[in-house]
């Protein structure tokens, strides 16, 4: 069964990777481990946005760059980029006075829209028999509904980063699975990834 996997990168990170030792994650190995053998993974579509250098964590963007380079060594993986928007908002201060302060807030934009568009477009172009969504974001429910309504020969699956899947997503899934630590542990890249032309990639030290 031709299976395409759509990964909400930030939902995956905050759902089951942050504050763990499993961030150096090989997605091809992970999903081959989780899915049954009749699934032939033809593409993995990874949706993310490039981090900017920040005072809070000045090396975060370098760790992300190393990981994206590692992902690009996987032959059937595509990376689709959204972007971060920086805007000024008024929010309550944790230690007043004053009670309200102006802060700069970074928000990732585009990943959920990009994922939905690719999911529908790939169904229309008959690029998969089964689409697997790796997310627990309820915003994906409408795209899943449209696929089920318009392409009744297509299967939809849901892999959630820990916890119970959102009811609004699960109702459109033919099956659902949850990622646990055992899945993550067996799907780590090696510390050093050799490349035939470019320089080798190393797991970030702080990971």
Across the structure, where does each feature detected by a protein language model lie?
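Nuclease catalytic cores that cleave nucleic-acid phosphodiester bonds
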Residues: 80-207
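Domain-level signal for Mg2+-assisted phosphodiester chemistry and nucleotide/NA-binding surfaces
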Residues: 1-104, 155-157
